[in-house]
Amino acid sequence: MEEQLIPIQWKDDALVLLDQTLLPNEVVYESFNTAEGVWDAIQVMKVRGAPAIGVSAAYGVYLGVKEFVESTEAEFIDEVKRVCAYLATSRPTAVNLFWALERMESVATDHTHLSITQLKDRLLEEAKEIHREDEEINRQIGEHALTLFHDGMGVLTHCNAGALATTKYGTATAPMYLAKEKGWDLKIYSDETRPRLQGSTLTALELQRAGIDVTVITDNMAAMVMSQGKIDAVIVGCDRVAANGDVANKIGTLGVSILAKYYNIPFYVAAPTPTIDLKTPTGKEIPIEERDASEVINRFGQYSAPKESKVYNPAFDVTPHENVIAIITEKGIVKAPFTENLKNLFQ
């Protein structure tokens, strides 16, 4: 087993991120000392995955105000709000980003009696707490998910909802790591996940380094491996779950869910509760980020289509709740009716 890749670290009063745009060929860690640097790291996907984005943004708030020139507490709180609003523009789909920023803003607005120095300390502690919570949430998701798995089964996953998308264990990959700890032998199939190839460059990399049996397939091979009986379950992560159980996740997830339903294979979604957005009624209201055409036709510095080609590049799609057998959270496994049962998680 190779040394574990650590996507997010806090060292020497700076945010240290593993640059995931360079994987699997280079392992490079980069330090960030400003909110602007964190914004850029999120936007260009040096850090990615809904939980990891949320944690990074939380640290970004602190970095954005730590050098704030001493003034009034009211002006400092306004600056916290400004930095939160700025970081919220980095990527629109992952609800963890907004959840984390709301927590950071609340630290300032709920503690107006503190001095500016005390507020700065409290902001950093809140960011660290969000970081710590994520690791525990992931393990709990893995423990619940493992009750749906058994030794020797074949599991398909899409994109990267692994340790690289969170702080440890991942969400969709958490049961894979825990199964490894139990001595189970799962057979993991990882869709490469066009156009940014997170399944092959990230999921396959981290599972292979952990000694977990993983096979990379192209996205359009999923139907074939299902038809061959190699897949017993599908598990994916998510960037947002609507109140009715519709799920926004990496582009291509919808197609995988349709195939799983056709072949009568259970389709599971691993979702930390901060990813569940009860304020969004259905998947139709989830904003879908559209990214640059170059990701599709010039991925490796050479055009794979005419340069002038029209390109449609949504980063996410929405899987209807009808295709989802269960949503696995740190609080337990949620099944239909999702509208009622998701709401019950927060009561």
UniProtKB/Swiss-Prot annotation:
One of its GO terms (biological process) is L-methionine salvage from methylthioadenosine. It catalyses: 5-deoxy-alpha-D-ribose 1-phosphate = 5-deoxy-D-ribulose 1-phosphate. InterPro entries: Deoxyribose1P_isomerase_DrdI, IF-2B-related, IF-M1Pi, IF_2B-like_C, Initiation_fac_2B_a/b/d, M1Pi_N, NagB/RpiA_transferase-like. The active site is at 239 (proton donor). This is 5-deoxyribose 1-phosphate isomerase. HAMAP family: Deoxyribose1P_isomerase (MF_02229), Salvage_MtnA (MF_01678). The gene is drdI. Keywords: Carbohydrate metabolism, Isomerase.
